[in-house]
């Protein structure tokens, strides 16, 4: 945890990206990690951790359900919406816990990523983003833009200097993945040449934050500090 949740911030301030795992046993050939990253959107331009990663997890729990429960607890703790890479078991866990609303609906998001021609597989679910080359490239483009963007370095609520956006990333293992990233020349099964689980979760958080910035600006959200039921969004004026 890089910053604990700030009480009273509007629902939608925190966006969680998730890359889950499919089985309890790790493969000898491919040792994937279960990962989750929480990004805080900007709510105070001169405050700390604006558009920063505030929490992250990467590991291989003995049981897949332990990871699902961890994500559920993090979402409750930060009052966050989740955009996972599509995994039916992950979606089922939240639906069975009556928390399906925490998972952001993806149809409009997919349209934004220029996927207007849905295959039957894509049309069969509304939660989670399919790992298609188009979606992966969109996420990678956001991660690159985020890292290269010039940002103001603020101290005591004063702008002191300008630095690259990558300075907002305090997760060293994510930085290591980004440094060692390799892509495939061309593939119908994805663009990543290797396991980049942290990066995948990170760009899912970015995709969701970018989407909410466009369609649901912070001032349009109901404060959800004392959430006791499914949160609802105010209709934009």
Roles of regions detected by a PLM:
Residues 105-160:
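Short alpha-helix plus adjacent loop in nuclease-associated cores
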């Amino acid at each position: 945890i890089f910053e604990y949740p700030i009480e009273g911030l509007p629902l939608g301030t925190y966006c969680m990206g998730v890359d889950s795992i499919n089985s309890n046993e790790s493969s000898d050939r491919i040792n994937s990690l279960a990962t989750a990253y929480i990004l805080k959107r900007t709510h105070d331009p001169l405050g700390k951790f604006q558009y920063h990663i505030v929490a992250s997890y990467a590991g291989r729990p003995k049981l897949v359900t332990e990871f699902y429960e961890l994500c559920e607890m993090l979402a409750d703790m930060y009052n966050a919406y989740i955009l996972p890479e599509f995994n039916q078991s992950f979606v089922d866990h939240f639906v069975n816990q009556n928390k399906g609303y925490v998972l952001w609906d993806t149809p409009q998001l997919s349209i934004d990523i220029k996927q207007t021609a849905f295959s039957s597989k894509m049309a069969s679910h509304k939660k989670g983003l399919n790992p298609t080359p188009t979606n992966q490239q969109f996420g990678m483009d956001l991660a690159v833009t985020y890292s290269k963007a010039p940002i103001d370095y603020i101290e005591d609520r004063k702008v002191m200097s300008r630095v690259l956006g990558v300075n907002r990333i305090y997760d060293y293992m994510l930085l290591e993945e980004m440094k060692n990233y390799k892509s495939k020349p061309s593939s119908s099964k994805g663009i990543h040449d290797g396991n980049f689980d942290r990066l995948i979760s990170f760009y899912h958080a970015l995709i969701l934050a970018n989407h909410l910035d466009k369609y649901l600006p912070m001032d349009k959200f109901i404060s959800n500090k004392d959430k006791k039921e499914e949160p609802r969004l105010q209709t934009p004026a």
